[in-house]
């Protein structure tokens, strides 16, 4: 089961060049960037042209957001946390990892920076927005505890049906996962994954089928998902428990839901920018953060 990409692209390289060139404007000499038979391109002319690019303001905004988040909460996100997430994607995509980066507009370093931005944003969310008792009670109504399953993802329905027949004949699920699953991220550990009902990286049909199973049971018919067909076996389906004992899990589920809400996260980022006193000095780029400033005034 492949994770769905949910990352905000940080195009910082051009923004970095923009700021570096901006700094050069304070120098008395206008350095030459390039020459041609009819003349030359100076830093000032290049900087002026660069500012006309429709994506420049977006890139500058992304760069400032990252720096503001990192200054405010950088100590809360370790290098190990980022590297572990990076390695998880690298393992998931295997030999296709570089293609994955290219398709999403990343270099290896910018991908790590994007991952770090996501973690920093989550820290900011928890620092700036607290979960109320009424919100916990609302979450409790639909709450389901984390479950652990084994799964086998196949590219076609016939293979999934054969897996189910093999299980009925007594074959081991973990061995079948290794030989028949096309999910390279889980096939070698028996197809085992743990998740909660609010997990948005998994197909709804997958979660619905899994939560109907009791411990030890497996799906009797293939489950259609985006990437193919699934056979699912329930390993651990705990009881829901009580509201009081589940508060920690409920809080985590509310934050997970909020982190996927773009309007909430925009408000959080706008507050971070306000708290960090972010100001753009160049009048041609001054409105790059206007959408966040407007949100900050209504928070």
UniProtKB/Swiss-Prot annotation:
Signal peptide start and end residues: 1-23
Membrane topology: Lipid-anchor
InterPro entries linked: Foldase_PrsA, PPIase_dom_sf, PPIase_PpiC, PPIase_PpiC_CS, PrsA_foldase, Trigger_fact/SurA_dom_sf
SUPFAM superfamilies hit by this protein: FKBP-like (SSF54534), Triger factor/SurA peptide-binding domain-like (SSF109998)
Gene Ontology CC terms: plasma membrane
Record-annotated membrane-spanning stretches: none
EC class (word): isomerase
Stored Pfam families: Rotamase (PF00639)
Entries under HAMAP family matching the protein: Foldase_PrsA
Family: Belongs to the PrsA family.
The name this protein goes by in its record: Foldase protein PrsA
Native source species: Lactococcus lactis subsp. cremoris (strain SK11)
Gene of this entry: prsA
């Amino acid at each position: 089961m492949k994770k769905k990409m949910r990352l905000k692209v940080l195009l910082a390289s051009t923004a970095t060049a923009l700021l570096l060139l901006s700094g050069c404007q304070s120098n008395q000499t206008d350095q030459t960037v390039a020459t041609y038979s009819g003349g030359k391109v100076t830093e000032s002319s290049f900087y002026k042209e660069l500012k006309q690019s429709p994506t420049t303001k977006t890139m500058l905004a992304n760069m400032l957001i990252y720096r503001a988040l990192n200054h405010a909460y950088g100590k809360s996100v370790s290098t190990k946390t980022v590297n572990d997430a990076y390695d998880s994607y690298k393992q998931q995509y295997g030999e296709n990892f570089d293609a994955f980066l290219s398709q999403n507009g990343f270099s290896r370093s910018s991908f790590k920076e994007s991952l770090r931005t996501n973690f920093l944003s989550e820290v900011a969310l928890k620092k700036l927005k607290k979960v109320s008792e009424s919100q916990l009670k609302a979450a409790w109504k639909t709450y389901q505890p984390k479950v652990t399953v084994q799964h086998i993802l196949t590219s076609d329905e016939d293979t999934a049906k054969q897996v189910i027949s093999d299980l009925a004949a007594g074959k081991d699920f973990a061995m079948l996962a290794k030989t028949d699953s096309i999910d390279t991220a889980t096939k070698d550990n028996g197809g085992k994954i743990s998740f909660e009902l609010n997990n948005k990286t998994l197909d709804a049909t997958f979660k619905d089928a899994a939560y109907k199973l009791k411990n030890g049971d497996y799906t009797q018919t293939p489950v259609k998902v985006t990437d193919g067909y699934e056979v699912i076996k329930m390993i651990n389906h705990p009881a829901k428990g009580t509201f009081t004992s589940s508060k920690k899990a409920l809080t985590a589920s509310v934050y997970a839901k909020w982190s996927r809400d773009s309007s909430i996260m925009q408000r959080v980022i706008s507050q971070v920018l306000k708290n960090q006193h972010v100001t753009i000095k160049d009048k041609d780029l001054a409105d790059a953060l206007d959408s966040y400033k407007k949100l900050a005034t209504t928070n």
